[in-house]
């Protein structure tokens, strides 16, 4: 099972990724984790990545792809892998294809943006304990204060509506085009590569966690 999980920020990808990993016994591959591990291990690719990072520059797509290829040689990838947050752009997807990285499924978790804004902007946190609440789905007993201590709750900057909307704008401009890219490849094929086209699946990310998990597993049969 080799797959890419797509969806907007707040669509619930992280929760469903954990279910997929457990069911199929595959690792979740995050480029951020890969970069940190390679830098820590001092591998040639890690040292190259460190030069970019120390200079405050973005690591090149070519280097990321080489890290991906190196990571896929590890024994835990024998039964497959789950890409999390990669590729983010069409050039990265093209580079993966040219590098011969095989993908069986591209799974999109689709949630309307107004629902995502409600989900994310409604989060509240008690800083000292890390306890989390939601003004709509899991409200505190008394509005704005922690159930245990009575101390005030905060809204993280990342959860403010303005920030959420900016993240969704970036998703629309950079990552959403990947959906069309993979859908077209799945439907029409691509004579420029010997790789089999992945199957593209879209599921609704609305409903309970268990309902969405059932849809995910149905889509991957």
UniProtKB/Swiss-Prot annotation:
Its EC number is 2.7.4.3. ATP binds at residues 10-15, 123, 132-133, 207. GO terms for molecular function: adenylate kinase activity; ATP binding. CDD domains: ADK (cd01428). Consists of three domains, a large central CORE domain and two small peripheral domains, NMPbind and LID, which undergo movements during catalysis. The LID domain closes over the site of phosphoryl transfer upon ATP binding. Assembling and dissambling the active center during each catalytic cycle provides an effective means to prevent ATP hydrolysis. Its main location: cytoplasm. It is found in: Cytoplasm. GO terms for cellular component: cytoplasm. Keywords: ATP-binding, Cytoplasm, Kinase, Nucleotide biosynthesis, Nucleotide-binding, Transferase. HAMAP family: Adenylate_kinase_Adk. The keyword Metal-binding does not apply. It catalyses: AMP + ATP = 2 ADP. AMP binds at residues 31, 36, 57-59, 85-88, 92, 156, 167. This is Adenylate kinase. Monomer. GO terms for biological process: AMP salvage. Residues 30-59 are annotated as: NMP. Residues 122-159 are annotated as: LID. Catalyzes the reversible transfer of the terminal phosphate group between ATP and AMP. Plays an important role in cellular energy homeostasis and in adenine nucleotide metabolism.
């Amino acid at each position: 099972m080799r797959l890419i999980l797509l969806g907007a920020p707040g669509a619930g990808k992280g929760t469903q990724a954990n279910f997929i990993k457990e069911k199929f016994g595959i690792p979740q591959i995050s480029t951020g984790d890969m970069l940190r591990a390679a830098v820590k291990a001092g591998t040639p690719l890690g040292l190259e990545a460190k030069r970019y990072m120390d200079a405050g520059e973005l690591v090149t797509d070519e280097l990321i792809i080489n890290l991906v290829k190196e990571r896929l040689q590890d024994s835990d990838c024998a039964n497959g892998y789950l890409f999390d947050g990669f590729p983010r752009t069409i050039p990265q997807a093209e580079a993966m294809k040219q590098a011969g990285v095989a993908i069986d499924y591209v799974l999109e978790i689709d949630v309307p943006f107004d629902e995502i804004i409600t989900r994310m902007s409604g989060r509240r946190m008690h800083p000292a304990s890390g306890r989390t609440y939601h003004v709509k789905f899991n409200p505190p007993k008394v509005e704005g204060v922690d159930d245990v201590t009575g101390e005030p709750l905060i809204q993280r900057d990342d959860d403010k509506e303005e920030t959420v909307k900016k993240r969704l704008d970036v998703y629309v401009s950079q990552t959403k085009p990947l959906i069309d890219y993979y859908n077209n490849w799945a439907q029409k094929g691509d004579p420029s590569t010997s790789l089999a086209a992945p199957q593209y699946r879209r599921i609704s990310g609305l409903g309970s966690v268990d309902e969405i998990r059932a849809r995910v597993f149905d889509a991957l049969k």
